[in-house]
Amino acid sequence: MSLWAKLDCAIDVGASRVRLLLRDRGVVLDESVDELDELDGFRDRGRLLAAILKAAFARVHLRTGWLCPVRRAVLAVPAGVSEMEKRIFEGALHSLGVKDVYLIESPMAAAMGAGSSVAEPKATCVVDIGARLIQAAVISLAGIVSCRSSERTGALDAKRLTARVIELIRDNIEDCRSKGRFNLIDDLAEKGIVLTGGGALTTGLASAVSEALNCPVRVADQPQLAVVYGVAKVLPELDSLRTSRG
């Protein structure tokens, strides 16, 4: 690939780490946010994100020797963000010279990165356990049917983390029931639940959740990278997405 080739980039900016994946190159950055730049003084959320990504892009260009800009990017965002927040995320990337910006909700990306078939009618349940945010979602036909989230305020030991995860899953089940989506509840009992994010590696978490809910629970391969891997699966579709935008 030419050093001047225009890049397509998958981005996952979490509370503690930022991960960048370049199409045809794989993960090129997986670092603590604090290591990238001095971020004190950036109170505006958009400017903060732009500062983080500017430092991340500079680090990638330095390491790879590529002289080209990122042309198109797909960024994972929390489920349920407002239209204003979406514009902030998009604006941060546009300010860095990224021409085309696409957003994908983190639970959807996590499920895709974990290898779940999100487009089929049968439901998938994913719980993404990040450094500060836990998101549990039920997905069917490439859409999020239900999503519940909880901020991790302070350190949670394994017992309290397990209780929090179980509570979020049960809230999703109740939401599906209230919407009359009983078939999705049956799907979850059959297909089980997938755990992603660094917190998924908590010792005994998967088995405790499985026992409490009486369904299969698995931890994704490389759960910390599930979101960015899922975002990367969108990159080959960018040409068609751009066409659909008009």
Predicted regions and their residues:
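Gly/Ser-rich catalytic serine loop of serine hydrolases
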Residues: 130-132, 198
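A structural feature that tracks compact, well-ordered secondary-structure segments
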Residues: 135-137
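Nucleotide/phosphate-binding catalytic cleft detector across ATP-hydrolyzing
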Residues: 1-15, 19-126, 139-193, 200-228, ...
